[in-house]
Regions:
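N-terminal localization/anchoring segments of enzymes in phospholipid and broader phosphate metabolism
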Residues: 1-431, 449-453, 465-489, 493-497
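Active-site glycine- and acidic-residue-rich loops that bind
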Residues: 441
Length: 497
């Protein structure tokens, strides 16, 4: 309201807006609406995981016994959830797609001659785990493929509904979904799927509310090849404050560079029309040896990654997939080229996905480097990924890179203990931890011990944090916060001072 932006439902429309909503529905939405008549079905049809649905009870005011049940999936993916309506000067009025559909229910169901419509929103969450141990006779790719298909049939584990839903409809849905645990049935408000608000129209005009455009890192303002810049010095990029272009440019340059021999890179989540993959395909076409470790177990990206695997292999790229009981979440790139008959390695170590779209909203760091030790160790990781059956010898004795589950926790424990000893000697000691989540009880116990010894501990945790409250005297205090702002905090940084 302070910015004159109003979100209205179908009961708050003026005459002009009502006409607009009817026309918009007819032109933009109607062809995506598929009503499901459900009251006589032995079981519910396939319902998408986490999609919004309208549960509709239709009847006549004159006949309380004549009613029908229907479901409509809200087509947020194809239409978009936020519709800007005509407004008076200086105001912006927005209507949610589910409310626009509810307004047009008399048109959708006109042939039933009903005059009373009761519609409420709900969504289900299905069991999304892919059990890779079940099908012993299948290879890894077949297991992933079968798991994706089985996910469609996954049992609902959570049912969130608008708390004013018609009681008969609510009872009907709970029974048909096979839900019997109260903890799985959650009443809520009118608005669900708040993640869609990441795509809320940018209608606020004040400059303070507009995201700044990513700016070019000063090093890249020089009209030089990315390789030449990295040869001069390491470059740390901070997304989304810095533009993601240098990462794409580095791969594109390598694809066209006659002296480049190979490109090795890991991939977890990719953009739908990935410029990264396009650059790698171009490199393969130009005769470079391109190796991509593609994590097929990236939750909800399994299907997309399987498609990318097929595309890349058809272009001659070597695609490595899957280590049992492990996800490869590292973001690494090693490029090898010949410079004056000497092998030179350069690339990057990053916290972000190889995704130029999410790089605009995820706060991440990327170190572009030619550092011999780091690149040698990164290359050893790729050697392990390609030959993991032969054991982890190549990566056990790393000196600089910390790798989970090999040496990361033990290294952190040693560093925490070092801060404890410094604090015990009366010096200032501190640890700052910035992570997506922190649930490792062994590390948390070490941090409790550190704080008792006088180490100042600051935690910046975006998601889950299993920190215990303590009433012990002289136990010290761990300062823990979560940053919620314009960007999604995605970086992993730990500072021992």
């Amino acid at each position: 309201k302070a910015n004159k932006v109003l979100i209205v439902d179908n009961k708050q429309l003026n005459a002009e807006q009502k006409e607009f909503v009817k026309t918009y529905f007819d032109n933009e939405v109607r062809h995506d609406i598929i009503p499901l008549m459900i009251e006589n079905l032995p079981q519910l049809p396939y319902l998408r995981d986490k999609s919004l649905y309208l549960a509709i009870v239709m009847g006549n005011k004159t006949d309380a016994y004549q009613q029908k049940f229907a479901l409509i999936e809200v087509p947020s993916r194809s239409v978009g959830r936020f519709i800007i309506l005509p407004s008076k000067a200086g105001f912006t009025t927005i209507m949610l797609l589910e409310d626009l559909i509810e307004f047009n229910l008399p048109i959708i169901f006109s042939h039933f001659k009903f005059n009373q419509f009761d519609a409420h929103v709900f969504k289900i969450t299905k069991d999304a785990e892919i059990d890779l141990d079940q099908e012993v006779g299948l290879n890894f790719i077949d297991k992933i493929s079968k798991g994706i298909k089985n996910r469609r049939k996954g049992k609902p584990v959570r049912f969130v509904y608008e708390k004013d839903m018609n009681p008969e409809m609510l009872e009907f849905l709970i029974k048909k979904l096979g839900l019997n645990r109260k903890s799985s049935i959650i009443p809520g408000g009118h608005i669900h799927n708040f993640r869609h608000f990441m795509d809320f129209p940018n209608v606020i005009k004040e400059p303070n509310y507009n995201r700044p455009r990513p700016f070019i890192h000063p090093a890249f303002k020089k009209k030089m090849m990315v390789f030449d810049l990295i040869m001069q010095k390491d470059i740390m990029l901070h997304f989304p404050y810095h533009a993601y272009d240098p990462v794409i440019d580095m791969l594109r340059e390598a694809a066209m560079d006659d002296t480049v021999i190979s490109i090795k890179i890991t991939a977890y989540r990719l953009a739908s029309n990935s410029k990264v993959i396009n650059a790698l395909i171009n490199a393969a076409r130009n005769g470079k040896k391109v190796t991509v470790f593609l994590e097929l177990k990236a939750r909800f990206d399994e299907e997309a990654n399987l498609e990318w695997k097929t595309i890349m292999e058809e272009e001659g790229i070597t695609v490595l997939v899957g280590i049992p009981n492990m996800k490869v979440h590292a973001k690494l790139c090693v490029i090898q080229k010949k410079v004056k008959n000497k092998l030179v390695q350069y690339g990057f170590i990053s916290t972000g996905n190889l995704n130029e779209k999410t790089a605009k909203i995820y706060a991440d760091h990327c170190l572009m480097t030619k550092n011999v030790t780091l690149m040698n160790e990164a290359n050893r990781i790729f050697n392990y990924l390609g030959n993991w059956e032969q054991g982890d010898k190549p990566i056990v004795k790393m000196r600089n890179l910390l790798i989970s589950p090999i040496n990361m926790r033990s290294a952190f424990m040693d560093l925490i203990e070092k801060e404890i000893q410094i604090a015990k000697k009366g010096y200032v000691a501190s640890i700052t931890v910035k992570l997506n989540s922190l649930t490792d009880t062994i590390l948390l116990d070490a941090l409790y011990k550190a704080v008792k010894a006088g180490v100042k501990v600051n935690l910046i945790i975006r998601g889950i944090l299993t920190l215990k409250r303590t009433n012990e005297k002289n136990a010290g205090k761990i300062n823990a916060i979560s940053i919620v702002d314009q960007y999604l905090e995605h970086a992993r940084v730990i500072i021992f001072n």
